[in-house]
């Protein structure tokens, strides 16, 4: 007899209008006979089943019949959609067995090395919704605290890749680009994709939303167009326009990655091994054959020393080579934000200025994007080495990149409402006269997040001065935009005693790294 058949009391299914993001949550009334008979506890995992379907969910116990009655079982919005049964359907409820793969997590917490089978079991259970957020957090902390050797990273990459669909473009060269993050602004992908696509090379760019930054590529692109594209729409769009700027979450590309990101984001976790596996599994799932990786180095970047950048590059190359991906990694300047805007709307302004060849466009964003695009164009066997930059520049200056960007925007679904920077604004001013010799990337990113970015699209930071600029006492260094009073006050309080700028003598100017 199955567990479902052994339970005599069945409950009526009820959707509960609560957004629990990617976690399945179930709701039982405290006076429910099943709750009392089974000895359930709040936050325990339960299994809900009927008609051969099953779903596991974290249990929440309620006392209000307006949420669920004693004869009902409630499921959060996401869980109800995944379960796929109508409201009022009779369902059975049972204790869920803990996932067997948690043994691997416990062994990793103890410092053991895991093999491919362990990671395959863990990622499979996560993909099936058998891990709660607490269990996923335990896995992330274990792999972050105790680290992953390069073969473990390879195993995790392959395991994550197997949990979702893998796109195939049936072309010998499918390009992609990725930055490991940590640098505010830096919205080069929104320039590289139209340049490369205008050249005719396939570049289906799928991106995550922000994890610990004020905006990810998908967050910024959503100011201009839809990014939540179904796989069939994505396929049609890319074949027509040769490129896209889409969110990877709706295409089920390595879905475990998105589930882990939902836990990484609030915890601020972004460990090296997880990062490599996350990036490469997503790129392989998107069908990439050639990848250009941007590793910024700077005193307040994710990677702060050149030796660490070289080590990370070797790890990417090791894993990339063994999964059949042609990968080139370049080390770039991470001493300060790239562009002037930090936050979705402000970053879009910078991007469009570059595409429109506006003389006010940020020079650093334009130059970095052209250099990276040039390296990607040199993947093309018909482009001679060293000529990629000039080809990319010609595509930009001729207006072909702008035209291609507008076609991509229209194909993805142009946003009807024009978004503007937040209406609540304050300026952060220099406390002394001198030269800007250092800028704290993390501080400015945190300021933008406190102001509401990326959830509030118009929130963020607009830089008025960069490294090497001479400023006077009391001169504005940057403006902070917010859409809601609470965010405005959070950001203003955060910047009340610090600016994130180091102002001093030009002799102490932060050294930069650039490798092209």
From Swiss-Prot:
Keywords: Glycosyltransferase, Transferase. GO terms for molecular function: 1,4-alpha-oligoglucan phosphorylase activity; thymidine phosphorylase activity. Pfam families: Glycos_trans_3N, Glycos_transf_3, PYNP_C. It catalyses: thymidine + phosphate = 2-deoxy-alpha-D-ribose 1-phosphate + thymine. InterPro entries: Glycosyl_Trfase_fam3 (IPR000312), Glycosyl_Trfase_fam3_N_dom (IPR017459), Glycosyl_Trfase_fam3_N_dom_sf (IPR036320), Nuc_phospho_transferase (IPR035902), PYNP-like_C_sf (IPR036566), PYNP_C (IPR013102), Pyrmidine_PPase_CS (IPR017872), Thym_Pase_Put (IPR028579). The keyword Acetylation does not apply. GO terms for biological process: pyrimidine nucleobase metabolic process; pyrimidine nucleoside metabolic process. Its EC number is 2.4.2.4. GO terms for cellular component: cytosol. It is an enzyme of class 2 (transferase). SMART domains: PYNP_C. Belongs to the thymidine/pyrimidine-nucleoside phosphorylase family. Type 2 subfamily. This is Putative thymidine phosphorylase. It comes from Methylococcus capsulatus (strain ATCC 33009 / NCIMB 11132 / Bath).
